[in-house]
Amino acid sequence: MEKKIAVTAGTFDLLHPGHFNTLNFAKKHADELVVIIARDETVKKIKGRSPVIPEEQRKIMIEALKPVDRAVLGSLTNKLEPILEIRPDVIVLGPDQTTYQINELKAQLAEHSLYPEILKVEDYVKCPFHSSYDILKEIVRRWCCKELKV
């Protein structure tokens, strides 16, 4: 019997409970979890800023997490490329993905005769720092005008 493979993707810059929630959710739906790490250049284009942590280091950190079996860097030219190479049975999307984005992804994958189950994490993890951006803002608030004591 073949292993059921799940894929999820993201920047995974400053890790927070939402990342762990998504990874654990994805692993519950498959035997093997492959995580696609967004490239630094791609993040800068989409978010208007580079990640704090470089892509290779983010990949190493994600690979070290318990639910993750393997991490790969995304493509610089075609966001579907790693998905088409992995050919997962399940794709897990975060809670911030819209129905339009999900339907668009299904259509794009169908063009390549790929029909994975697409699952969306519905619940946000409620905590003070539930996004990498919130963590970064808090670091700046606490430390930008103070002398760092090492």
UniProtKB/Swiss-Prot annotation:
Alphabetized UniProt keyword annotations: ATP-binding, FAD, Flavoprotein, FMN, Nucleotide-binding, Nucleotidyltransferase, Transferase
* Source taxon at top rank: Archaea
- Catalytic activity reported: FMN + ATP + H(+) = FAD + diphosphate
A Pfam family (short name) is CTP_transf_like
Instruction: Please indicate if the UniProt record lists Nucleotidyltransferase as a keyword.
Output: yes
Q: Which cofactor does it need?
A: a divalent metal cation
Chain sites annotated for binding ATP: T11, F12, H16, P17, G18, H19, D96, Y124
Q: Name one GO molecular function term.
A: ATP binding
Q: Where is the signal peptide?
A: none
EC number from the UniProt entry: 2.7.7.2
GO terms for biological process? FAD biosynthetic process; FMN metabolic process
Give the pathway: Cofactor biosynthesis; FAD biosynthesis; FAD from FMN: step 1/1
Q: How does it assemble?
A: Homodimer.
* Family to which the UniProt record says this protein belongs: Belongs to the archaeal FAD synthase family.
User: What is the recorded function of this protein according to its Swiss-Prot or TrEMBL entry?
Assistant: Catalyzes the transfer of the AMP portion of ATP to flavin mononucleotide (FMN) to produce flavin adenine dinucleotide (FAD) coenzyme.
Q: Please state what the protein is called.
A: FAD synthase
Query: What is the originating organism of this protein?
Result: Methanococcus maripaludis (strain DSM 14266 / JCM 13030 / NBRC 101832 / S2 / LL)
Lineage at the top is: Archaea, Methanobacteriati, Methanobacteriota, Methanomada group, Methanococci
Gene label: ribL
